[in-house]
């Protein structure tokens, strides 16, 4: 969650630096989803600390975290494209654009490793819903 918060802070800083407001609603939505993920992680940790099994929550967390990571990195790319700034542009000497591209491409695989999101959804359907 901490890494996702750092990505969100970088996106927010970039959006402010270019005066970008068109994607503010999407940014706010991601912020709420990140807070929700944080609370869910804490709830699961409390369950484990009490000696209980997390059950379906581990599958739910995997889906929430990977989809959120993908959406955060996608927003990072969208606002950079919106500003017309290329990955290795002189406007971004710290290579933040290149890092955004690496993060974006890297998160695509997160929905596969650890069990694809589709498999995780099937696990939840079978265990929680009895389907």
Model-assigned labels for residue ranges:
Residues 1-131:
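Alpha-helical interface subdomain recognition
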């Amino acid at each position: 969650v901490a890494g996702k918060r750092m990505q969100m802070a970088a996106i927010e800083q970039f959006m402010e630096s270019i005066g970008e407001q068109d994607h503010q609603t999407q940014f706010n939505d991601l912020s709420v989803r990140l807070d929700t993920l944080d609370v869910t992680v804490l709830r699961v940790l409390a369950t484990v600390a009490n000696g209980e099994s997390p059950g379906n929550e581990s599958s739910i967390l995997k889906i929430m975290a990977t989809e959120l990571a993908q959406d955060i990195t996608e927003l990072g790319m969208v606002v950079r494209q919106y500003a017309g700034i290329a990955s290795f542009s002189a406007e971004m000497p710290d290579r933040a654009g290149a890092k955004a591209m690496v993060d974006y491409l890297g998160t695509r695989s997160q929905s596969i490793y650890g069990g694809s999101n589709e498999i995780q959804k099937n696990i939840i359907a079978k265990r929680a819903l009895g389907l």
